[in-house]
Amino acid sequence: MAHKKAAGSTRNGRDSEAKRLGVKRFGGESVLAGNIIVRQRGTRFHAGSNMGIGKDHTLFALSDGKVQFEVKGPKSRKFVSIIAD
């Protein structure tokens, strides 16, 4: 006769790895060409001047300068630009 209750099974206990999304360089920071500014899913931030966009919607600097965030347009879209020094 068992003196301990048998262990139950569970369907929990899994989680996906964090993807490290978000803003990597903030407004006013100096960046070099090629630096990643924002990692995102979809275009929460849009590419402004001197910015490139990767196939996974990553925004990166195309030239050296300072990062500038701005909201513009009738839909109040957030744009990220690089202002040359």
Curated annotation (Swiss-Prot):
SUPFAM superfamilies attached to this UniProt entry: Ribosomal L27 protein-like
Gene Ontology molecular function: structural constituent of ribosome
One GO BP annotation of this record: translation
InterPro entries: Ribosomal_bL27, Ribosomal_bL27_CS
Region (Disordered) residue spans: 1-20
One Pfam assignment: Ribosomal_L27
Keyword Ribosomal protein: yes
Keywords: Ribonucleoprotein, Ribosomal protein
GO CC terms in record: cytosolic large ribosomal subunit
The family this protein is said to belong to: Belongs to the bacterial ribosomal protein bL27 family.
Family matches, as NCBIfam families: L27 (TIGR00062)
Protein name: Large ribosomal subunit protein bL27
Organism: Colwellia psychrerythraea (strain 34H / ATCC BAA-681) (Vibrio psychroerythus)
